Curated annotation (Swiss-Prot):
Signal peptide: none annotated. It comes from Rhodospirillum centenum (strain ATCC 51521 / SW). One of the primary rRNA binding proteins, it binds directly to 16S rRNA where it helps nucleate assembly of the platform of the 30S subunit by binding and bridging several RNA helices of the 16S rRNA. Belongs to the universal ribosomal protein uS15 family. This is Small ribosomal subunit protein uS15. Part of the 30S ribosomal subunit. Forms a bridge to the 50S subunit in the 70S ribosome, contacting the 23S rRNA.
Length: 89
């Protein structure tokens, strides 16, 4: 359910805005999205795992808040991020 340190580092490298960047909204959203995808796959096989389901809802809420913040601060970065992550259809 969790992501490996190597995968997390790869996401940081892919979505960073500058060198040494680990906390920008883009990086945080990318990491949360990866965790959400993994947890969604887990819940497909373990439908009655309600503790994990609640954790999923918390993560989705965190991602929504970060995306709202990014949209408020910089619409262009927001649009680029959701396109790269494939969040909107």
């Amino acid at each position: 359910m969790s992501i490996t340190p190597e995968r997390k580092q790869a996401l940081i490298e892919e979505y960073k805005t500058k060198d040494g960047d680990t906390g920008s909204p883009e990086v945080q959203v990318a990491i949360l999205t990866e965790r959400i995808v993994n947890l969604t796959e887990h819940l497909k096989t373990h439908a009655k795992d309600f503790h994990s389901r609640r954790g999923l809802l918390v993560m989705v809420g965190q991602r929504r808040g970060l995306l709202d913040y990014l949209k408020r601060k910089n619409q262009g970065r927001y649009d680029t991020l959701i396109q790269r992550l494939g969040l909107r259809r």
